C-alpha cells in the first residue's frame, strides 16, 4: 500500500520469519498453493510481488530507518504540542526497548468532530481510520452478541482521529 512506511506503487507485502516450515508454507500460499510447478498442495492465491514493485521497494528499503526516524521526530513534536490539552489523548509508547514507527499518529478526543472541523478550516487534513469496530460489521454479525461487552472498543471508535503523519512533515506544517 503506497501510504505505508515501506509502500510501493500498489499493494504488496512481506513476511519475515526464522521458521523454515512457515517460510515454505507462505511461499506456497503466495503462488496458488504450488509446492512445485503445476503441483498445488493447498489452496492459495496469486500474491507474488511483481518486479516493478520489487524494484521500487528495493530503492526505498535502505531509506526505511531514516524515514521512520523522521516519523518519530514528527510524533515527538505532536506529543509536545498536544501535552496538557484537555480532551486529547496522544498515543502511548512502551517504555522498553521497542520503537514505534508511526505509520499513523492517532489521537483520541471526545470532541472529534469539532477538532476535525477546526483542522479542516485551517487546511489540515485528518482522517478517521476504522470508524466501525469489527464486531459492528455485517460480515462479523456473529460477534454482535458480544457488542455490549466491548464498551472500550465502541468508545474508542467514536473518539479516534488520525493527524497528518509522513516523514517530510515539517515543523511549520
Model-found features: residue ranges?
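Conserved active-site segment immediately N-terminal to the catalytic lysine
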Residues: 1-9, 36-41
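Active-site phosphate-binding strand-loop segment of PLP-dependent enzymes
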Residues: 2-8, 16, 162, 166
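Short, well-ordered alpha-helical segments in soluble proteins
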Residues: 4, 13, 30-33
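Adenylate-forming
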Residues: 8-12, 57
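PLP-dependent aminotransferase class I/II
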Residues: 18-173
Amino acid at each position: 500500500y503506497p501510504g505505508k512506511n515501506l509502500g510501493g506503487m500498489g499493494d504488496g507485502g512481506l513476511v519475515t520469519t526464522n521458521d523454515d516450515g512457515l517460510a515454505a508454507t507462505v511461499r506456497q500460499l503466495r503462488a496458488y498453493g504450488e509446492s512445485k510447478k503445476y503441483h498445488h498442495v493447498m489452496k492459495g492465491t496469486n500474491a507474488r510481488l511483481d518486479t516493478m514493485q520489487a524494484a521500487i521497494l528495493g530503492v526505498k528499503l535502505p531509506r526505511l530507518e531514516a524515514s521512520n526516524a523522521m516519523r518519530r521526530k514528527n510524533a515527538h513534536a505532536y506529543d509536545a504540542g498536544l501535552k496538557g490539552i484537555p480532551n486529547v489523548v496522544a498515543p502511548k509508547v512502551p517504555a522498553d526497548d521497542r520503537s514505534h514507527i508511526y505509520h499513523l499518529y492517532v489521537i483520541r478526543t471526545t470532541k472529534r468532530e469539532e477538532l476535525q472541523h477546526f483542522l479542516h478550516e485551517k487546511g489540515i487534513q485528518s482522517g478517521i481510520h476504522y470508524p466501525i469496530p469489527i464486531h459492528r460489521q455485517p460480515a462479523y454479525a456473529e460477534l454482535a452478541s458480544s457488542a455490549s461487552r466491548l464498551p472500550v472498543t465502541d468508545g474508542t471508535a467514536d473518539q479516534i482521529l488520525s493527524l497528518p503523519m509522513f516523514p517530510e512533515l515539517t515543523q511549520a506544517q
